[in-house]
């Protein structure tokens, strides 16, 4: 089934572009996966969580250049999409941890393959630029 991901985009729900994206996501696994993964910083966050449970502060320090607002938004997006789990310990000071969900764990080996592919193809494509 199609998730709300594309409907949250800037496209009007009755626009041709929206309907095309929705149809593609409903019928193509790659397109569906990419709607979940597309967005600046999402892959970086998932990669950190692939390594293990992380807290907001450590992710903020480790992901160079990400703003607090963007990290907060992307964590919410990934949680809403079911790729990560947020655990709030309800303590003072606040303690919140993030980890991959079952769906996120299934993505973990694919992230490794994407990383390997990127490392392999980058020098080839960079020569062509």
Where are these regions (language model features)?
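Amphipathic alpha-helical dimerization/coiled-coil segments
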Residues: 2-17, 105-129
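N-terminal helix-turn-helix DNA-binding core of bacterial DNA-binding proteins
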Residues: 21-70, 94-97, 128
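Basic amphipathic alpha-helical segments that dock to polyanions
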Residues: 71, 75-78
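Basic, amphipathic "hinge/linker" alpha-helix immediately C-terminal to the N-terminal HTH DNA-binding motif
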Residues: 90-114
